[in-house]
Amino acid sequence: MQRHSNQRLAHLVFSRACITVLLLAFALLIPAACAQTYDLSTLPAYPADADKPQIHGVIRIHGTELTQHLIHLWEDGFLKQHPLVRFGDYMLPSGFSGLTAGTADINVMGHTAWRSDLTAFEGAFGYDPFEVMFATGGFNLRKGNTPAAIIFVNRDNPLTGLTIKQLDGIFGAERSGGWIGTRWSTASARPASENIRTWGQLGLTGEWKDQPIHLYGIDATLSNWSELIQRVVFKGGDKWNPAMNEIVRGGVEVPADAQIVSSVATDKYGIGFNLMRVVEKNPGVKPLAIAANPDGPYVVPSSRSCYDRSYPLVNAVYLYINRKPGTPIEPTLKQFLIYTLSREGQQAVVEDGMFIPLNPEADARELQKLQ
């Protein structure tokens, strides 16, 4: 559905006002301790009137239902600064094609772009789309999305943590290489001898030593977590341990996430990946700390370790534009991107409640990319 900001209809304004009132009313029910989790005071404020350029034009944004509310918050805040700018929005289940077809200026994704999207774009233009991380994925937010991948085991398992290399050995398989964007690299190849299939290979002794590791996870063919694990753990590879019990989302009796967690809770030798707000509800399992390097440190998954991005399996959400390498970003578009990364833009991320705002270091890196 297209929304033209230069023709704000009365019923749309009324609807937004009603939604705002309802959100404010709900916020009153939330304990004060949860009202403000992140300190945004060190993020750069959007420039004052005297310091920002006077711009106008139309920005066409493609997004999804998951990002629609956040996009509207950004637009409303930006229009207060630049009233001559207009927006055209299209909210689609999969909207990356708009960037490739030239019908969108910005694509706001609830995840990183799939390789098929990148391949199509590169085929059309000969270079990769320009990527900006605008928030960190959720952790255990009430309506959070794109959450970190939590690795968990049965509560009786003596393990407390695993390294990324060990996770590769457990969940992965022999591979000849991996994808870096749309390019295949043999740098991430590994032999079958690095597979980890028993608990004894992780140093467990006694009754655990010769027991096989039972894997549980979401269908590895297409999911946000699967993509994250392939990118971070498998170094771009896409070969999984064929023994994994893949549970497909869409079941009518028990949600797949709950099935995965309950399976590990009843399987002493099980291990799985899922989101924290499901894992923490089941006392039969425990999350593991994860280390990016063999010598540590091991980082416990938490809201704080996701915010500072020290947890190795933290997720993120991105927006994309068509920027030819070595060329400047169109001024109106650049100002909107700056706004999304400003203190005001990141406050909108907090208000939206889907994602975690960027920490100052991550925010500064993304702003630098716009120069």
In which residue ranges do the predicted regions lie?
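N-terminal secretory signal peptides that target proteins for export/translocation
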Residues: M1-F14
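Hydrophobic alpha-helical segments, principally membrane-spanning helices and signal/leader peptides
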Residues: S15-R16, T327
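Intrinsically disordered, low-complexity repeat segments enriched in small/polar residues
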Residues: L9, L22-L23, A33, G88
